[in-house]
Amino acid sequence: MQRELVGYPLSPAVRGKLVAAGFQTAEDVLEVKPSELSKEVGISKEEALETLQILRRECLTNKPRCAGTSVANEKCTALELLEQEHTQGFIITFCSALDNILGGGIPLMKTTEVCGVPGVGKTQLCMQLAVDVQIPECFGGVAGEAVFIDTEGSFMVDRVVSLATACIQHLHLIAGTHTEEEHQKALKDFTLENILSHIYYFRCHDYTELLAQVYLLPDFLSDHPKVQLVIIDGIAFPFRHDLEDLSLRTRLLNGLAQQMISLANNHRLAVILTNQMTTKIDKNQALLVPALGESWGHAATIRLIFHWEQKQRFATLYKSPSQKESTIPFQITPQGFRDAVVTAASSQTESSLNFRKRSREPEEEC
């Protein structure tokens, strides 16, 4: 049964314009593209995107479901939810220390935010994961595909070629120690050409294009059911530079976050969001904190913070519903994202970082 627009949490002004333009139900509106809706109704593109986000989110949330299912009114027990957690799967990072503190790797059905200053390794991890998500199941992978949404132009296909080549070589070494025919058969399809052809790349130049692309993702994922990873590399960039209205920015970001959570649950995939760091002045000290403010800090299920300590890269698991807070060193090599060589100095630094981060500072609205 179709639900009339009066039953949705839209502003009276927008609802009135929709009705005046002949729209009666949410289904009528959801069939229209954001740019067409803006022209037809006489509202801004931002209002059109926000309206479509609200309607799509409400249509999803008004259908009770188990996590990862799409059957309306289906009931779940706590035991079934626990079993889903145990069988949800992980995408390995090729850094065993990071995989360990995450409980096995980047989890499916959850959103993970990776924060850090430029050059610390956020995009490197994203490109590594876009390759790793395609590792065959017999090698411990999930045999999926990846969507890569780039807002800053940081994606480097030559680097992906290097990462994919190293991954293929690594799996061939593993297969050499196994006599099972399954491993050799899987490697026939795990080629450089196939890896690159299963990374779907989208370049978004501003927040309007980003929101529109996120809005279109459910249909894309329905057409590409093997996608197990969605990456937005640079969530803060378009909102910090193109949008001055903070209240509108907050609403759009909240809508985007809810959309990504729905995608993770409904399509049983992992979501990666990278975020920049900003400077906060507190008690005459300059502190680096994740951008987009404290409210955005609740958007993702898991938050990782990458940072430098002297010349060593570190990853801190800052927020997780199931794993304790931890800090580990890592390195970026020509082959990709890897474990760091642990030294006495780095171990001492790691201990001090674990102690220091217990005293948390709230993120600044930026």
UniProtKB/Swiss-Prot annotation:
ATP binds at residues 116-123. One of its GO terms (biological process) is telomere maintenance via recombination. Its main location: nucleus. Residues 343-366 are annotated as: Disordered. Keywords: ATP-binding, Cytoplasm, DNA damage, DNA recombination, DNA repair, DNA-binding, Mitochondrion, Nucleotide-binding, Nucleus, Phosphoprotein. Essential for the homologous recombination (HR) pathway of DNA repair. Involved in the homologous recombination repair (HRR) pathway of double-stranded DNA breaks arising during DNA replication or induced by DNA-damaging agents. Part of the RAD51 paralog protein complexes BCDX2 and CX3 which act at different stages of the BRCA1-BRCA2-dependent HR pathway. GO terms for molecular function: ATP binding; ATP-dependent DNA damage sensor activity; crossover junction DNA endonuclease activity; four-way junction DNA binding. The gene is Rad51c. The keyword Mitochondrion applies. This is DNA repair protein RAD51 homolog 3. GO terms for cellular component: cell junction; cytoplasm; cytosol; Holliday junction resolvase complex; mitochondrion; nucleoplasm; nucleus; perinuclear region of cytoplasm. Belongs to the RecA family. RAD51 subfamily. The modification Phosphoserine is found at residue 11. It comes from Mus musculus. Residues 70-127 are annotated as: Interaction with RAD51B, RAD51D and XRCC3. Expressed in the heart, brain, spleen, lung, liver, kidney and testis but not detected in skeletal muscle. Residues 1-117 are annotated as: Required for Holliday junction resolution activity. It is found in: Nucleus; Cytoplasm; Cytoplasm, Perinuclear region; Mitochondrion.
